[in-house]
Design a protein with these regions (language model features):
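Gram-negative (and chloroplast) outer-membrane scaffold detector with strong preference
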Residues: 25-30, 39-41, 72-150, 211-225
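Outer-membrane beta-barrel translocator domains and adjoining extracellular loop/strand segments
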Residues: 45-54, 95-102, 143-153, 195-203
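Hydrophobic alpha-helical segments of small multi-pass membrane proteins
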Residues: 115-117, 133-139, 162-172, 187
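N-terminal, post-signal-peptide region of Sec/Tat-exported proteins
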Residues: 48-87
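Cleavable N-terminal export/targeting peptides
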Residues: 1-29
Length: 225
């Protein structure tokens, strides 16, 4: 085979790949909106509950699967990057609250209401699948810890707001039509050790350092304008 034929074949192969490569790196600009449902988990925490009706130090809490939902409004810049404002609510059921061998509560929940600004790097291609990764920073509008005692006595509720919470995400988007897409991703949010004051049931009391770092999976739909 001559050098000319090899060179010609290489040029033809490279030329045939250029349109696909160019398309893989571009996407249309525009606004999009998303709505999603969420399954979430958080780890166990040991914290202190102060106040006249507080349990004191060494309180151990465990939580079950959380459920939540949310949505975002975003903008694609046409170069693989997007920015979005997200709102999220989730609640995790309390499964155990103990101090040593003593059961303190039989019911309750740990819930949050958060607004975030996310930056997203999308990897568009000629296929229907578009992987993406992102990071964001949120403001906790409210995080609530509700405790319902195992024995007689009123419930106690604690609330906090204003904490910053970073977020990481990784997922994929699937094009159903030119405007509708299915999305699924995993997200890790870190609010850290929360300090919350009593809202009801323990006047002047507080909880110190129950952690709130949920890991979640989202499934939703997205509409592009």
């Amino acid at each position: 085979m001559s050098v000319f034929r090899v060179t010609r074949s290489a040029v033809l192969l490279l030329t045939s790949c250029l349109p696909a490569a160019a398309l893989a790196q571009t996407e249309s600009k525009g606004v999009y909106v998303t709505a999603y449902g969420q399954v979430s988990r958080i780890g166990a925490s040991t914290f202190t509950e102060s106040g006249a009706r507080g349990a004191g130090a060494g309180v151990q809490a465990k939580f079950g699967r959380g459920l939540g939902g949310g949505g975002d409004v975003g903008y694609r810049f046409g170069n693989g990057w997007a920015a979005e404002v997200e709102w999220n609510y989730r609640s995790h059921a309390l499964t155990s609250l103990r101090q040593g061998t003593t059961t303190l509560a039989q019911d309750g929940d740990y819930a949050s209401n958060i607004v975030l600004i996310n930056g997203v790097r999308r990897f568009p291609s000629t296929r229907a699948w578009t992987p993406y990764v992102g990071a964001g920073l949120g403001v906790v509008l409210e995080v609530d810890l509700d405790l319902r005692p195992a024995s007689s006595g009123g419930s106690r509720a604690y609330s906090s707001s204003g904490r910053l919470a970073p977020q990481l995400m990784s997922g994929v988007e699937y094009a159903l039509t030119p405007t509708w897409r299915l999305i699924t991703d995993a997200r890790w949010l870190r609010a850290g050790a929360v300090s919350a004051d009593n809202a009801t049931g323990n006047s002047g009391g507080s909880v110190r350092s129950p952690r709130y770092n949920p890991l979640s999976v989202q499934v939703g739909v997205r509409y592009g304008f």
